[in-house]
Amino acid sequence: MDKYLTYSVVERKDPSSPEVQGKYYAQAQARGEAGIREMSQRIQQMCTVTRADVMAVLIALEDVVADSLANGEIVRLGELGSLQVSLSGSGTVTKEEYHDGLIEKAKILFRGGKTLNNMLGTLKFEKVDQKYKKKEEEDRPGV
């Protein structure tokens, strides 16, 4: 069975020229979410481990990834990809003037690896009108 990535068409205007007619672009639309419980169930069906074991490992992975990123490490998840912290803020004229108070924001960068990049090359697309509405409840154990 073919899998299709859904998209809708949205108008985007140039913020510097709001009076100019915008152009229409594709915007990916989620069909739903795959939470930790569903992912654990799917993985269980592919392996010899139980769903509970998979969930335990994934929850531990969350903690280890967060700790590694906080320690300034690049987290490499095999061919899935890598995560790294990136900083943004104000600049100074000289290196000596710079101090950590000028750092305004930290964010996490994800770079897809071979597995995800290969998937991108096989995508097929389906145009939809309606946007996905997020579920009210979070799919987390114990919540």
Residue map of PLM features:
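Strongly charged
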Residues: 1-56, 63-143
